[in-house]
């Protein structure tokens, strides 16, 4: 391959890297878990990361059990899972 072809390939790979969003391999695995309100009957505002919509969404948390995809603030959810 000529040096021009190699430079073109390098440029295309660099562009691909820049345009590719953060990979799911870079976020914690628990960010892929579904929202889980838990087994208690509380009524607490919480947030979870929805991997299909690529955003943090609100849900009602019961106050116990559930899973790790559960954040008190949307900012905490974004910092952990959507970055």
UniProtKB/Swiss-Prot annotation:
Disulfide bonds listed in the record: 31-81, 40-64, 56-77
TM annotation in the entry: none
Compartments where found: Secreted
Domain BPTI/Kunitz inhibitor: 31-81
Keywords, in A-Z order: Disulfide bond, Protease inhibitor, Secreted, Serine protease inhibitor, Signal
Cited function: Serine protease inhibitor.
One annotated GO molecular function: serine-type endopeptidase inhibitor activity
Taxonomic placement: Eukaryota, Metazoa, Chordata, Craniata, Vertebrata
Main subcellular location of this protein, as a coarse class: secreted
Protein name listed in UniProt: Kunitz-type serine protease inhibitor stephenin-2
Organism: Hoplocephalus stephensii (Stephens's banded snake)
């Amino acid at each position: 391959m000529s040096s021009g072809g190699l430079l073109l390939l390098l440029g295309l790979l660099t562009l691909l890297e820049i345009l590719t969003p953060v990979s799911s391999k870079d976020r914690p695995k628990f960010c892929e878990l579904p929202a889980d309100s838990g087994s208690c009957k509380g009524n607490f505002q919480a947030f979870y990361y929805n991997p299909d919509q690529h955003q943090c969404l609100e849900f009602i948390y019961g106050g116990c059990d559930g899973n790790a995809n559960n954040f008190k603030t949307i900012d905490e959810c974004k910092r952990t899972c959507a970055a």
